[in-house]
Amino acid sequence: MSKDALNLAQMQEQTLQLEQQSKLKQLVNEDLRKQEESVQKHHQTFLESIRAAGTLFGEGFRAFVTDRDKVTATVAGLTLLAVGVYSAKNATAVTGRYIEARLGKPSLVRETSRITVLEALRHPIQQVSRRLLSRPQDVLEGVVLSPSLEARVRDIAIMTRNIKKNRGLYRHILLYGPPGTGKTLFAKKLALHSGMDYAIMTGGDVAPMGREGVTAMHKLFDWANTSRRGLLLFVDEADAFLRKRATEKISEDLRATLNAFLYRTGQHSNKFMLILASCHPEQFDWAINACIDVMVHFDLPGQEERARLVRMYLNEYVLKPATEGKRRLKLAQFDYGRKCLEIARLTEGMSCRKIAQLAVSWQATAYASKDGVLTEAMMDACVQDFVQQHQQMMRWLKGERPGPEDEQPSS
């Protein structure tokens, strides 16, 4: 009896499981059917949307094409839009070139008194006040030359200033002579005396530019022509790139740059004045010589000029700092006038720059001392050292063999 009851219970349990599985399958099938219906509805809705959009676009396009006024207005609008975009692009480029030509400093310019955009943004008050408070300076202020050369450069300064006042054509000048004789300083003073801007470039910067040299040269003169005050363009070491094209071995890029320079300086201008400085003017191309109006020789200072230079630099680098008391520097008591004359006699053959370096060495020697006092003996030691260095440099320059004190003992 119990066995039949157990079998009956098992059969009922199996029946219940089958019923549950059947219901579960029905639920799964119902979910699948609903999902399939949802996908079909979404697909049908998407297709209907595409058909409606296509119909709407087609009808709109058909209406647009058949309406001549709308077509004309659209074409005109697109044309104006294209012209506007093209004009804006080119106007931006032109504006950039204009700003660069007017205010940007060319890559060849090492130093200039013209106000650049960067300097104006960094120090606007300082730049404006410098321009408003600037006054013409004496062309020979801080420049020591022989009496004949002083008269010559003063005449040039008067001529240049009057040319600027009367808006005449500037003359091209060649300053030649040994290095350190005051050519660059005179060019700066000439610009300030005449109320002009100045720009300094060096000939050694041209050759490394290669193919960019021609473009840089044209940018330089385009920039020079925009100066309202007139520009004095000073080319230091001009012989570095203005060499003879017929005999010198120069690259094609440098030759093209030289041709561009000759083209821009072939005629006189009321916008810029050209000053060339060279230690070897005999190396110039003949076309450069034809462009030069005035030649001025800056020679080494004589004994009288050296005495003036020694006094000037002694005052600038030693006496003035010592009297101000702001630095650790004092000067012993001795006859300064006699010492300046003695030093002028010993420094024969030295340039203005060398004498300035000698005065700087006096200052450095005083700073190196324990008490900061520059004595006469310390000055004499510096002078003797500079004289020996100058003699050695002259031996190198002349190609002479070193003296007995420099020769090595034979083995």
UniProtKB/Swiss-Prot annotation:
Gene3D superfamilies assigned to the protein according to its UniProt record, in alphabetical order: P-loop containing nucleotide triphosphate hydrolases
Keywords: ATP-binding, Nucleotide-binding
InterPro entries the record matches: AAA+_ATPase (IPR003593), ATAD3_N (IPR021911), ATPase_AAA_core (IPR003959), P-loop_NTPase (IPR027417)
ATP-binding recorded as keyword: yes
CC terms in the record's Gene Ontology section: mitochondrion
GO MF term set: ATP binding; ATP hydrolysis activity
Keyword ATP-binding (UniProt): yes
GO biological process terms held by the UniProt record: mitochondrion organization
Domain of life, source organism: Eukaryota
Residues at which ATP binds: G177, P178, P179, G180, T181, G182, K183, T184
UniProt family annotation: Belongs to the AAA ATPase family.
PANTHER family registered for this protein in UniProt: ATPASE FAMILY AAA DOMAIN-CONTAINING PROTEIN 3C, PUTATIVE ATP-ASE
Protein name listed in UniProt: ATPase family AAA domain-containing protein 3C
Species in which this protein is naturally found: Homo sapiens (Human)
